[in-house]
C-alpha cells in the first residue's frame, strides 16, 4: 500500500508472501479472509499502539487501503 517506507522491499515482500501462503492454505472465501485480516489489523492496533494514536493510525491505514484499490 505505502509507496515510501523505512522498510526494504525485501522485508515487506517476505511478510506479504508468508501471509498470502497462510491465507491460500485455508482456501477460504474472500469475505472471510478480509474479516480475518481486519481482525488482525484491529488486534495489532489495540495491542501495539497507544490508545491516543489508534484512531489516527486506523484512519491512515484505511485511507491508504482505499487509495491502493483506486489505483489498481
Swiss-Prot record:
InterPro entries, per database record: UPF0352 (IPR009857), YejL_sf (IPR023202)
Cited Gene3D superfamilies: YejL-like (1.10.3390.10)
Residues making up the signal peptide according to the UniProt record: none
Domain of life from the UniProt record: Bacteria
Family to which the UniProt record says this protein belongs: Belongs to the UPF0352 family.
Annotated protein name in UniProt: UPF0352 protein CGSHiGG_07710
Organism: Haemophilus influenzae (strain PittGG)
